[in-house]
Amino acid sequence: MKLLKGLTIMLILNLSLFALTSCQANNTDTASYEQISPEEAKTIMDTETDYVILDVRTVDEYAEGHIPNAVNLDHEDISSKAEALLPDKDALILVYCRSGRRSKIAAEALVELGYSNVKEFGGINDWPYEIVK
């Protein structure tokens, strides 16, 4: 009887440790960016004051038209130039490109560089608001 009780306690302890270990292994908070809609990005632009709009298209594409107050940094230059252009890694950064593909790549690269508040909102092709040249 004592042996059965001891085995039961050991089994419960082992299962508890296994459950805790499993929870801990799945609780890996990986940093990531947030994908938002153009409408959500516009709301942020209209209501917030402390943010950066980052256009990750080429210089030529940027010159053809961009969102007002956007800063241009080609997505291919993120890893080499982002820290000089964007020194505050906690700043809210709104990222876009032409169609949404490059902005996702750029947003991911920014997160890998340690930026903590990155929101990607697709491409200027889907931007229904003002564009400046």
Predicted regions: what is each one?
Residues K2-T8, L17-E39, I44, Y51, ...:
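Rhodanese-like catalytic fold shared by cysteine-dependent sulfurtransferases
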Residues I12-N14:
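Non-catalytic accessory regions used for complex assembly or targeting
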Residues I53-D55:
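Hydrophobic beta-strand scaffold positions of dinucleotide-using enzymes
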